């Protein structure tokens, strides 16, 4: 396993220029999920990811339509009996580039300055999507795949993933795994890989509090009849 790891790292290093070129190509797609004018770009980005999976020779690759933007799925099975399964989550949508005046270059024309690459989505999270895909490529080129791997790459993370819950509910068997990996986090330092193991999600609630049907005199009823505003403050 150690030799395979070393070989994979060597492969990644020798193919770094190509990997970077492909990332730049991905970054030129303005896959802005909040903007209806970019619906075609969302489909283009989803197909681009699916094409990456196909080029790797994954066992199954599919672009699933949703009520919003597509979900891209891919999986590759290990030949090792009883191998664990990891599900890698990612998203191909990005935030709008506005305010444009804060950019020194076009947000969708990647520019490299030293070791840094500047473009919308470079770090959130097209860079991580490509890094994960290319890491798998490096492993496959250097030996056998030790685990089963699945990818779920959505296009609505930047708008709260409104259709992801339903998609997951409908495909529980397909998405079954031993653990999940979300590379959409930060690092302590550029040269120190970091795993975030407690990441909060989103939860939406609507609270309704019913009170008196008409105004009550605060001097007479204050403190006796619970004020809905006070009850809400206590709940929050």
Model-inferred region functions:
Residues 2-120, 139-145:
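Acidic/His- and Gly-rich active-site-bordering loop/insert found
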Residues 71, 148, 202-204:
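Broad gene-expression machinery/nucleic-acid interaction feature
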Residues 115-130, 158, 222, 226-230:
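Short, conserved micro-motifs enriched in small and acidic residues
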Residues 123-198:
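Acidic/histidine-rich catalytic neighborhood of metal-dependent amide-processing enzymes
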